[in-house]
């Protein structure tokens, strides 16, 4: 039998190789940013690293079906719901950031002071492309692999740490790098919750959320206020939304779980388990019917045995009375013959009585679960109980006939002797 489950060693090796290739390519691709002549806030060349790493891992490692399970492009109702959330959550973060700028900095600038000559449409297209190539590698490929051995929450933590290392910005000081790490980790945790239980349909949700977030950053960074203040606002706002969204999601799922369990424990009328009680009542009724049938069979067996005994006595009396009208010698010979017949009849009647009792006992120990079996057993028992009575009558007639023939023969012999 073929086992399609990915092994623990390959699981770990896939994650390790993906991360190493991604980090190595991000370092090598930095030099190509100036070559292509595109500003870094429009499109980062280093963002191609996760896409290339995912393609290499798919080609190198086996279990292609498992690796490609997170790359489904179909649409479902849940995907549409998460797409709406992927647009709403960045808007909430943007509102919190703008409020923070107004409260703590007294103003905010909608665009950076440099690069204003670039059309907004070019920036939007560039951010969509960046979001697609990054999320293809990290969410559609890597998180799908990690979730084969972990649940979604812990898989999001692992992928979030790797994504934060990949997106680390050490251009400024340590404090800036720390807030940037907080921002990217919170960003990744929100994305992990958004793509939860979408059955591999992750690319649309991840791309939409990523592009919305990165596109919104250009409205909050201000050269006059400083990059440190901007990254603080972005990081804290994203962290607040991440905690709120994930916490609310856990609460809703917990309530749904408790409600479902309570509904299963407190069964209402006409529920799907009512047939259990019906079966118990049916079995109880069948048991009572079987017990009553057994008692009737036992009574019939006893009555049959008594009838056989009475028939035996009648036969003996009849056979004994008929020879008494003849002479002494003839009576002695006839009586001797009848005694022999009676003894054999007594043995046969004893066997018949034993069979009747055994039939009654077999009915008593017969299975009681099936109505058809009970009916067939009752018919067989009645038939077996009727057979001894019929046989008794036939046997009695046979004995009387034999006795009459013997008497006639004896009379003929006596008349011949007298002559």
Curated annotation (Swiss-Prot):
Task: Relate the assembly described in the record.
Answer: Interacts with N-acetylglucosaminidase SagB; interaction is direct and facilitates peptidoglycan processing. Interacts (via N-terminal region including transmembrane domains) with sensor protein kinase WalK (via N-terminal region including transmembrane domains). Interacts (via N-terminal region including transmembrane domains) with sensor protein kinase SaeS. Interacts with other histidine kinases, perhaps via their transmembrane domains.
Query: In its UniProt entry, what is this protein called?
Result: Lysostaphin resistance protein A
User: Which residue spans traverse the membrane?
Assistant: 9-29, 41-61, 84-104, 118-138, 152-172, 175-195, 202-222, 231-251
GN (gene name): lyrA
Which locations, inside or outside the cell, does it occupy?
Answer: Cell membrane; Secreted, Cell wall; Cell septum
Q: Species lineage, top-down?
A: Bacteria, Bacillati, Bacillota, Bacilli, Bacillales
Job of this protein: Involved in bacterial cell envelope homeostasis. Regulates peptidoglycan processing by N-acetylglucosaminidase SagB, perhaps acting as a scaffold protein. Pleiotropic regulator of gene expression, probably acting via interactions with multiple two-component systems. Plays a role in the abundant deposition of the immunoglobulin G-binding protein A (spa) at the cross-wall, a subcellular structure that initially arises from cytokinesis.
Enumerate the residue ranges of region (Disordered).
273-419
Q: Name one Pfam family in it.
A: Rce1-like
**Which GO biological process entries does UniProt record here?**
CAAX-box protein maturation
Cellular component terms per the entry's GO annotation: plasma membrane
């Amino acid at each position: 039998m073929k086992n399609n489950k990915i092994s623990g060693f390959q699981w770990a090796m896939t994650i390790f190789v993906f991360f190493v290739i991604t980090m190595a390519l991000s370092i090598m691709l930095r030099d190509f940013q100036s070559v292509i002549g595109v500003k870094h806030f429009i499109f980062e060349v280093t963002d191609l690293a996760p896409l290339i790493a995912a393609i290499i891992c798919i080609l190198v490692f086996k279990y292609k079906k498992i690796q490609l399970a997170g790359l489904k492009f179909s649409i479902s109702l849940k995907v549409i719901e998460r797409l709406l959330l992927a647009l709403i959550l960045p808007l909430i973060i943007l509102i919190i950031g703008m409020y923070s700028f107004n409260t703590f900095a007294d103003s905010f600038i909608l665009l950076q002071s440099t690069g204003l000559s670039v059309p907004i449409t070019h920036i939007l297209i560039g951010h969509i492309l960046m979001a697609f190539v990054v999320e293809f590698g990290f969410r559609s490929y890597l998180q799908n692999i990690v979730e084969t051995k972990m649940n979604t929450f812990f898989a999001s933590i692992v992928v979030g740490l790797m994504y934060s290392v990949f997106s680390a910005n050490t251009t400024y000081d340590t404090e800036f790098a720390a807030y940037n790490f907080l921002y990217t980790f919170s960003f990744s945790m929100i994305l992990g919750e958004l793509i939860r239980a979408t059955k591999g349909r992750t690319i649309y949700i991840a791309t939409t959320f990523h592009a919305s977030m990165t596109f919104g950053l250009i409205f909050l960074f201000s050269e006059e206020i400083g990059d440190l203040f901007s990254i603080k606002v972005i990081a804290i706002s994203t962290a607040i939304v991440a905690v709120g969204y994930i916490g609310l999601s856990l609460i809703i799922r917990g309530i749904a779980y408790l409600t479902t369990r309570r509904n299963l424990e407190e069964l209402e009328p006409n529920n799907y388990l009512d047939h259990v009680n019906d079966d118990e009542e049916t079995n109880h009724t069948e048991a009572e019917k079987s017990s009553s049938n057994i008692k009737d069979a036992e009574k019939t067996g006893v009555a049959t045995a008594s009838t056989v005994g009475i028939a035996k006595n009648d036969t003996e009396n009849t056979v004994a009375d008929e020879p008494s009208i003849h002479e002494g010698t003839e009576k002695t010979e006839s009586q001797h013959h009848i005694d022999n017949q009676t003894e054999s009849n007594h043995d046969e009647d004893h066997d018949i009585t034993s069979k009747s009792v055994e039939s009654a006992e077999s009915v008593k120990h017969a299975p009681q679960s099936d109505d058809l079996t009970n009916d067939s057993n009752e018919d067989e028992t009645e038939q077996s109980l009727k057979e001894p009575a019929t046989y008794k009558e036939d046997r009695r007639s046979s004995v009387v006939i034999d006795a009459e023939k013997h008497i006639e023969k004896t009379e003929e012999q006596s008349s011949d002797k007298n002559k």
